[in-house]
């Protein structure tokens, strides 16, 4: 089937795109390469060598399967997003096109505004475009369990909605689980799920919103096929996940705390 992967050049998007192509799907990566630009802004980079996007795609086509690249900023160019969906007619879109680092989202005013503008507007643009073009397109979104916070006060987190009883009316209701985001980034993921709930309720969009834990690691079966397919390995204090930093410290004989 045809699958569009928004943010397919990033840490999660790239190996996902390769996996989908390896399974026989026709994959279109859509990305504005913002993660590479942020590397320059922070004067940091991946521990692994990341090939230019053109080399990445050529290598993926040679070793993996049917995969293409479209440069597009879906936050700033909703018309371009609509044109792409009309042209490609995907069965599913996978949405990774968001600034993903909680520490980055808390650096300062510019980073806070960029994270909110990019993440929430990109999500809304996808939903709005699908309403106009084809409501049968499936949306798969990578959220984060961080929208719930890390307190034990609210108890275990259920799948789907939380069933409650409203005291004043004694009526039962299904609501989104209580949010307690710890950063601007996590807050945007909570706002995303409000957007998704609204579009599902009013237009019946088919949406899978995944709230997973920390994603970590280096390689997959596909990224290991050729040097140009190598995935990111961020180990800095902004984009490096705690697992990656622990791995880097252990490899250098440092004690992990």
Feature map (PLM): residue ranges:
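A conserved pocket-lining segment of Rossmann-fold NAD(P)-dependent short-chain dehydrogenase/reductase
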Residues: 105-106, 172-180, 207, 212-214, ...
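N-terminal Rossmann-like NAD(P)+-binding domain of SDR-like oxidoreductases, especially those catalyzing
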Residues: 1-218
């Amino acid at each position: 089937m045809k699958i569009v992967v928004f943010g397919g050049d990033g840490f999660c998007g790239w190996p996902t795109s390769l996996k989908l192509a390896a399974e026989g799907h026709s994959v279109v990566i859509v990305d504005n390469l913002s993660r590479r630009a942020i590397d320059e802004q922070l004067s940091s980079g991946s521990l692994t060598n990341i090939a230019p996007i053109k080399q990445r795609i050529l290598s993926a086509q040679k070793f993996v399967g049917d995969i293409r690249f479209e440069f597009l900023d879906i936050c700033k160019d909703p018309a371009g997003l609509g044109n792409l969906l009309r042209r490609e007619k995907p069965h599913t879109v996978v949405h990774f096109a968001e600034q993903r680092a909680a520490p980055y989202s808390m650096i300062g005013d510019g980073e806070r505004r960029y994270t909110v503008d990019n993440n929430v507007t990109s999500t809304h643009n996808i939903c709005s475009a699908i309403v106009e073009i084809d409501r049968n397109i499936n949306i798969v979104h990578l959220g984060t369990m961080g929208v719930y916070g890390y307190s034990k006060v609210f108890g275990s987190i259920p799948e789907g909605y939380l069933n409650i009883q409203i005291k004043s009316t004694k009526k039962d209701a299904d609501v989104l689980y209580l949010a307690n985001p710890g950063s601007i980034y996590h807050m945007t993921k909570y706002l995303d799920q409000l957007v998704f709930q609204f579009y599902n309720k009013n237009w019946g969009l088919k949406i899978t919103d995944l709230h997973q834990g920390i994603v970590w690691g280096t390689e997959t079966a596909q990224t290991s096929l050729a040097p140009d397919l190598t995935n990111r390995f961020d180990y800095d204090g902004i984009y490096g996940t705690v697992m990656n930093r622990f791995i880097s410290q252990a490899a250098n004989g440092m004690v992990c705390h």
